[in-house]
Swiss-Prot record:
The keyword Acetylation does not apply. It comes from Bos taurus. One of its GO terms (cellular component) is I band. Interacts with TFIP11. Signal peptide: none annotated. It comes from the Eukaryota. Residues 88-126, 162-351 form a coiled coil. This is Tuftelin. InterPro entries: Tuftelin_GRINL1A/MYZAP/CCD68 (IPR051375). The modification Phosphoserine is found at residue 171.
Length: 390
């Protein structure tokens, strides 16, 4: 699974003299754990065909297979090239990691069993007792490895072996109890952390919702102010047009007044007309002054509205920044929560594997007193399956 070719041998062993009440043994071993003699014996008992599944890195979408003869000519190797999809890469990596962890747990259990066997063997070697007990323990160890093939008789274990085994069981039981206590403490800590994370997450979500509502309101107010500014600008344009028209009329009246004054200064009618024109000019000037004041006031209002609009935009930008920070905090908390879940699952799987090991060990120690070994059934050729990954 590490990018090179790894071999995994699956063998169905049918010993000789198989009866109706016997049990078939199915063994899964790694290629690196088998010696040359064992591989040759397994190959002779298994069939003459070997299926190899090869993961190819080619970009084609076809499924190719290849039939290859082995070097010794006693078996056939059928290679099947599997093309993985890019979308299944994450699932494939997850399965690989899970298989690696399972293999690691199996290796730890096997190492513990091997250590226990070595301890028992060393104790029996130091004991100057009868050799029958050694033969009994050797039979037990061979039975655990699945290598017992001949007829064996039942022996009773010595009291010293039972005492040592009981001590080992008690130590394993204490270790399991300590690990269970640690697991419960870790679960309680995880639950408290989860509740704290949930409270913090809900608080951040509420703050994000409130910020979004405030942002929406600010955007609505900004749109309303923009509409008001547009209306004021249209009014200013109309007032400027009216101002230009009135200014043109004033100039025309002044021109006519000067003409009348130049034509007939002594004419009363012209004087009255001139007076009327002067009054009109004065009224128009007052109107112009009033319009000028209104124009200045509207310009001040427009400047104030523009300043308010800029302030609203600054507030909106600050709200956007706050919302982005809250989203980043939420993503960070979710990532921490997922990491905590993965750690708890890993710890629970490890504790479960240790619990299964202690149960199997206790069952084996209880059966050390009386051992009954059935006759090995006759071998039956089965196919040898090898999984190759490139």
């Amino acid at each position: 699974m590490n990018g090179t070719r790894n071999w995994c041998t699956l063998v169905d062993v049918h010993p000789e003299g198989q009866t109706a009440g016997s049990v078939d043994v199915l063994r899964l071993t790694l290629q690196s754990e088998l010696t040359g003699d064992e591989l040759e014996r397994i190959a002779q008992k298994a069939g003459r065909k070997t299926y190899a599944m090869v993961s190819s890195h080619s970009t084609s979408h076809s499924l190719a297979s290849e039939l290859v003869e082995s070097n010794d000519g006693h078996e056939e190797i059928i290679k099947v090239y599997l093309k993985g999809r890019s979308g299944d890469k994450m699932i494939h990596e997850k399965n690989i990691n899970q298989l690696k962890s399972e293999v690691q747990y199996i290796q730890e259990a096997r190492n513990c069993l091997q250590k226990l066997r070595e301890d028992i063997s060393s104790k029996l070697d130091r004991d100057p007792g009868d050799s029958v007990h050694k033969q009994e323990i050797q039979v037990v160890l061979e039975k655990q490895n699945g290598l017992s093939e001949g007829p064996l008789t039942t022996y009773s274990s010595p009291p010293e072996v039972d005492t040592h085994i009981n001590e080992d069981v008690e130590s394993l039981r204490k270790t399991v109890q300590d690990l269970l206590v640690k697991l419960q403490e870790a679960e309680q800590q995880h639950q408290s952390d989860c509740s704290a994370f949930k409270v913090t997450l809900s608080q951040y979500q509420r703050e994000a919702k409130q910020s979004q509502v405030a942002l929406q309101r600010a955007e609505d107010r900004a749109e309303q102010k923009e509409a008001e500014v547009g209306e004021l600008q249209r009014r200013l344009q109309g007032m400027e047009t009216e101002y230009q028209a009135i200014l043109a009329k004033v100039r025309e009246g002044e021109t006519a007044l000067e003409e009348l004054r130049s034509k007939n200064v002594d004419c009363q009618a012209e004087q009255e007309k001139a007076a009327n024109l002067e009054k009109e000019v004065a009224g128009l000037r007052e109107k112009i002054h009033h319009l000028d004041d209104m124009l200045k006031s509207q310009q001040r209002k427009v400047r104030q509205m523009i300043e308010q609009l800029q302030n609203s935009k600054a507030v909106i930008q600050s709200k956007d920044t706050t919302i982005q920070e809250l989203k980043e905090k939420i993503a960070y908390l979710e990532a921490e929560n997922l990491e905590m879940h993965d750690r708890m699952e890993h710890l629970i799987e490890k504790q479960i594997s240790h619990g299964n090991f202690s149960t199997q060990n206790r069952a084996k120690t209880e059966n050390l007193g009386s051992i009954r070994i059935s006759k090995p059934p006759s071998p039956k050729p089965m196919p040898l399956i090898r999984v190759v990954e490139t």
